[in-house]
Curated annotation (Swiss-Prot):
PANTHER family cross-referenced by the UniProt entry: 50S RIBOSOMAL PROTEIN L28 (PTHR39080), LARGE RIBOSOMAL SUBUNIT PROTEIN BL28A (PTHR39080:SF1)
Name this polypeptide is given: Large ribosomal subunit protein bL28
InterPro entries xref list: Bacterial_rp_bL28 (IPR050096), Ribosomal_bL28 (IPR026569), Ribosomal_bL28/bL31-like_sf (IPR034704), Ribosomal_bL28_bact-type (IPR001383), Ribosomal_bL28_sf (IPR037147)
Family: Belongs to the bacterial ribosomal protein bL28 family.
Record bears the keyword Ribonucleoprotein: yes
One term under GO cellular component: ribonucleoprotein complex
Length: 62
């Protein structure tokens, strides 16, 4: 399963609850994007969440 290279975010699981409080499993997936970033001074293609990109924790390399 893919995960965010920087923050380690991956799919989270939980329950969908109806009005009668019946439960069924559901999942929340991070918005992963394939990006080329610098890792140890070298460009590398990795999966990074859109939130990580927007926050400026990492910058893309062209």
């Amino acid at each position: 399963m893919a995960k965010d290279f920087i923050t380690g975010k991956r799919t989270q699981f939980g329950n969908k609850r109806s009005h009668a409080l019946n439960s069924s499993r559901r999942s929340w997936k991070p918005n992963l994007q394939k990006a080329t970033i610098l890792v140890n001074g070298k460009p590398k293609k990795v999966y990074v969440s859109a939130r990580t990109l927007k926050s400026g924790k990492v910058t893309r390399v062209n």
